Design a protein with these regions (language model features):
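Metal-cofactor-binding active-site regions of metalloenzymes
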Residues: 1-170, 179-184, 190, 194-195, ...
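Conserved hydrophobic beta-strand within the GNAT/NAT acetyltransferase core sheet
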Residues: 172-174
Length: 312
């Protein structure tokens, strides 16, 4: 049994269905194994965003993602997407309903949503996403995120948005320390983030790593994705082992199951082989994920007991 906290809906679209809808094999458009940069990697989202406008498509892709999670033995997932990317034909209400309808067809996996603000959006559009998150909080949506081109839109410039997020008591996570330096992670910490997407470049600063440890801030680490975007050139250079050994709270995630052509089972296998992580480590990563999830304390307890029963 596994828990996944960092997973993008539009980066995890079923290839067979996408190919069927396009009338051709679209594997090359959806998989970005040799992207070489985050901005290049993000180009693989163009087709999914086009396909995720129709409500039937949205429901079907969501259902197939839930089936994929079930096959990967995931019992809880937080799936993120930007609501404003999918409203060419429909309202946000209809889009969210279609996603939840698709997810609910697979009763073995509990899935909550995280809305993403985008770095390249205007402040007005991101404020709209904050308003939408407020409206849907507790109705399938559990938090807000900031995603997109980190290198060209620096984290520190979004301070006002996160002041608004905090003012509205919205739980949040922030993509940081992926395509930009440890300063980006420091900015996320300054905003009060308890969870950081990727965050691997924190390793550039002992002080930042120390702050993560003392404040109990968790990193949503996505190893294969980091290889694809060339955050690290080889898995052996990934800082995950150093971070775990130092005492940083780490969770393991896929980021984008289709774009990175991966599953949690694959991620675990890679980490097992490269860093000799064992079953106890993976249990701990999953317990970290439960503790750092945006679930209620009661839901966390239930999930923890499920995991412990299964791993024992």
């Amino acid at each position: 049994m596994k828990v996944e906290l960092h997973l993008h809906l539009d980066g995890s679209c079923n290839i067979e269905l996408a190919s069927q809808l396009e009338g051709k094999d679209v594997s090359n458009e959806l998989i970005a194994s040799n992207a070489n940069s985050l901005s290049k990697y993000l180009e693989s989202f163009t087709l999914p965003i086009k396909l995720l406008q129709d409500l039937d498509n949205i429901e079907n892709f969501s259902y197939l993602l839930a089936k994929e999670l079930e096959k990967d033995e995931v019992i809880y997932a937080e799936v993120r997407f930007c609501p404003l990317f999918h409203v060419e034909k429909n309202s946000v209400n209809e889009v969210v309903d279609a996603i939840i309808k698709g997810f609910n067809k697979v009763s073995t996996v509990k899935i909550n949503l995280i809305f993403c603000m985008m770095r390249h959006f205007s402040e007005k559009d991101n404020m709209k996403i904050i308003e939408l998150t407020k409206r849907f909080l507790g109705k399938g949506v559990v938090a807000i995120d900031l995603a997109g081109d980190e290198a060209n839109f620096k984290t520190h410039s979004f301070e006002e948005l996160f002041e608004e997020v905090k003012k509205n008591n919205i739980p949040f996570t922030i993509h940081a320390g992926e395509a930009d330096s440890c300063e980006s992670v420091q900015s996320a910490i300054n905003f009060g983030a308890k969870r950081i997407g990727h965050g691997v470049r924190c390793i550039e600063s002992k002080d930042v790593v120390e702050t993560l440890i003392t404040r109990g801030i968790s990193l949503e680490i996505c190893p294969t994705s980091n290889l694809d975007t060339k955050v690290v050139t080889e898995l052996k250079n990934h800082p995950i082992k150093k971070l775990v050994d130092a005492g940083v709270l780490v969770t393991i995630n896929t980021d984008n199951r289709t774009v990175s052509n991966t599953t949690l089972a694959k991620e675990y296998d890679l980490l097992r082989k490269e860093f000799n992580f064992n079953d106890d480590d993976f249990l701990q990563f999953n317990l970290n994920a439960v503790n750092c999830s945006f679930l209620s304390d009661e839901e966390k307890e239930i999930l923890k007991n499920k995991l412990l029963d299964n791993w024992n």
